[in-house]
UniProtKB/Swiss-Prot annotation:
Keywords: Cytoplasm, DNA-binding, Transcription, Transcription regulation. This is Probable transcriptional regulatory protein CLL_A1008. It comes from Clostridium botulinum (strain Eklund 17B / Type B). The keyword Cytoplasm applies. SUPFAM superfamilies: YebC-like (SSF75625). It is found in: Cytoplasm. NCBIfam families: PRK00110.1 (NF001030), PRK12378.1 (NF009044), YebC/PmpR family DNA-binding transcriptional regulator (TIGR01033). GO terms for molecular function: DNA binding.
Length: 246
């Protein structure tokens, strides 16, 4: 079945910041705390917390770090309140960009996000200006290695997956509805499947090709956003030039 994640194309542009393991753990730690605040500290009764714990483990986050984040959100180790704010806007060539933040200072985050858009040749827009161009989907990325494609596809679809993409060179990409994400992930985990990445995210309906000049500008924007302490996720619909390397 064909998919539309273009996972490899996008991940190649994120590798520079994703290699900073400490930043990743900080971002996931914030998500854990917000999930606990909203639904309680027990993963048995808090589906969102269970999903984020799985995401943390896929990122090789140590168990004691996960536990510490949960305790902090429960008030056992003090507490910090984060506000979830979504920013939308445009990059070079009209690329659609959604920036998800968790912040304890919305004035700081708004200023930093706006600055990143400007420095990257884009502009921050109003709420909803590009959101309609994306769909919220669950996505699990699995290393192909020696796995049988047909067997993997049947496992995913039987578990309730919406789509299975084997077009990428090195990975399978399983797509679900947000509601079915946890169920499908747990079913695949029960079969011994491990994930390179597993999360609910915003996936664009279509992609916008950009040339090398705009790719350089846009990469600058992505680096600024992804290095910002308040930014959790950056979603976009840019298709970088073939063979593009930062």
């Amino acid at each position: 079945m064909s998919g539309h994640s273009k996972w490899h194309n996008i991940q190649a542009k994120k590798g520079k910041t994703d290699a900073k393991r400490g930043k990743i753990f900080t971002k996931i730690g914030k998500e854990l705390m917000v999930a606990v605040k909203n639904g309680g500290p027990s993963p048995e009764t808090n589906n969102r917390l269970r999903d984020i714990i799985a995401k943390a483990k896929a990122a090789n986050m140590p168990n004691d770090t996960i536990t510490r984040s949960i305790k902090k959100a429960s008030g056992e180790l003090g507490s910090v309140n984060y506000e979830n704010i979504i920013y939308e806007g445009y990059g070079p060539s009209g690329v659609a960009v959604i920036v998800e933040t968790l912040t304890d200072n919305k004035n700081r985050s708004a200023g930093n996000v706006r600055s990143a858009f400007t420095k990257g040749g884009g502009n921050m827009g109003t709420q909803g200006c590009v959101g309609f161009m994306f769909q919220e989907k669950g996505e699990m990325v699995i290393e192909k290695a020696d796995k049988d494609e047909d067997e993997m596809m049947m496992l995913a679809l039987d578990a309730g997956a919406e789509d299975f993409n084997a077009d990428e060179d090195e990975v399978f990409v399983v797509t679900t509805t947000p509601e079915d994400f946890g169920t499908v992930r747990e079913a695949l985990e029960a079969e011994g499947i491990e994930f390179l990445e597993a999360d609910v995210k915003m996936i664009p309906d279509t992609y916008t090709a950009i040339d090398e000049a705009d790719a350089k500008k846009f990469q600058k924007m992505l680096d600024l956003l992804e290095d910002d302490e308040d930014v959790q996720e950056v979603y976009h619909n840019a298709e970088f030039p073939e063979g593009w390397e930062e």
